[in-house]
């Protein structure tokens, strides 16, 4: 197993730029576009969570398939807008335990790890916040982890407002020790890894119907639309983060989630946002 197969990531546009002048020009255009998007109102950034993607859900009689070890979620190809059909039948055994007394009455927020809260690399990062040793085929490799700006404030506030669950398509041997270092406050009530995803058409999908929580009270925060193709109406999408230390997206999200925590269900507020 090679190093990158441990971590599920999107491609850094800067790496595309380094490969070729043509790719670099396209990457630069993407970077400019992303910076413009960050400058918009935080409310407008949520509109994309209701875009329909040209990706089919598994048939109703199709059992959940455990994913093989491949490198990363592929990007979704935008085509004709079609309705995404949710995954039909929930499993007999849910991924999460019963809600604790501490979290009773709170909504459940599923939070992604890579490029949402942190960026990790097998290449040395001079200003890495953590260096995590990971064993691959009998050899110890160092993973350099950079924290997204304001991740500490974001996690602490989210832990006060919601039942928080870490759900990553990366392997536990990498993600678990990173979560130990990142979550100093015990915000995550549970941690779900690649084996808890559904492998569907080359992507690791986080099927929210398998959590054991009422879907109207579940939100997923993720940088990859492929991760929530079964439940796009539950998603609060974020921009992929790599190394921009001026990024404020997590900080900007806090007031939105403070309002969402007071709603009866997640759909009402998200629908109101899209109708503006």
Swiss-Prot record:
Which Gene Ontology CC terms are recorded?
nucleus
* Sequence segments annotated as region (Disordered): 1-31
What PROSITE patterns is this protein classified in? Answer: FCP1
User: Cofactor: bound how, per the entry note?
Assistant: Binds 1 Mg(2+) ion per monomer.
GO terms, molecular function: metal ion binding; RNA polymerase II CTD heptapeptide repeat phosphatase activity
Active-site residues, record numbering mapped to chain: 112, 114
**What keywords tag this UniProt record?**
Hydrolase, Magnesium, Metal-binding, Nucleus, Protein phosphatase
Q: Where is this site: Transition state stabilizer?
A: 168, 206
Give the enzyme's EC designation.
3.1.3.16
Q: Which residues bind Mg(2+)?
A: 112, 114, 223
Q: Broadest EC class?
A: hydrolase
What's the chief localization of this chain?
Answer: nucleus
What the entry lists under CDD domains is as follows:
HAD_FCP1-like (cd07521)
Cofactor(s) the record lists: Mg(2+)
State which residue ranges cross the membrane.
none
**Presence of keyword Magnesium:** yes
Instruction: Quote the Gene3D superfamilies the UniProt record gives.
Output: HAD superfamily/HAD-like (3.40.50.1000)
Q: How does it assemble?
A: Monomer. Interacts with REST.
Which protein are we looking at?
CTD small phosphatase-like protein
Give the species: Mus musculus (Mouse)
Q: What lineage does UniProt assign to this protein's organism? A: Eukaryota, Metazoa, Chordata, Craniata, Vertebrata
